[in-house]
């Protein structure tokens, strides 16, 4: 059994055009997809408020095998929210005021959370997570693997300083950034995965390149949570079999399914 912890963002995704509100956020999207895999125990560490959005987060994973014992429910707190806009092709975009961090922005790990991290096999988070440095500091006392999503960051000089602590590196982009990761894979003992939207994905490990095509969909409904679902499937597959190519194929299939509906997962 692989013990995976997903951190920390849980929020309400508000789809502006339709007015629909769904639970989302990287930690929640990841956990809801990872829990589909056998031999995986997935839990979430993070904070929500005791408001309607927080209750929607909890409702979204009712009945799913996700451990919620480390979700902090802040009395009188405001759950994070994100206002999402969609193009005619289903690609999401945001306005400057789309994001409201709520209690997620002020969350800090408890001692119980730190113990849970140290007892895990894999910790998944984004590079923007407030608990990032806290989690990295725990690697000295435990052997968990750290998986980090760098989204669309391009400050590669700063990013490289973080690589000694990272085991799985995820980023979204285009083929022009691939040489960076090919070079890094020869220098750092890390698996570097680059998702390329409709052009599939590429992974570098120890200088070797692995490529995988995207799984086509008849219609792209919404790209929200696509990366999270890919990362969840990739990590769960790799933890089970240690095969990069299979993990990429699994990630592509999961992302394709996510493209077919509104929101990062169905509930």
Language-model features and meaning:
Residues 3-4, 15-82, 88-89:
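Substrate-binding N-lobe of the ribokinase-like
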Residues 9-10, 229:
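Active-site metal-binding loops of divalent metal-dependent hydrolases
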Residues 182-267:
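Conserved phosphate-binding/catalytic region of the ribokinase-like
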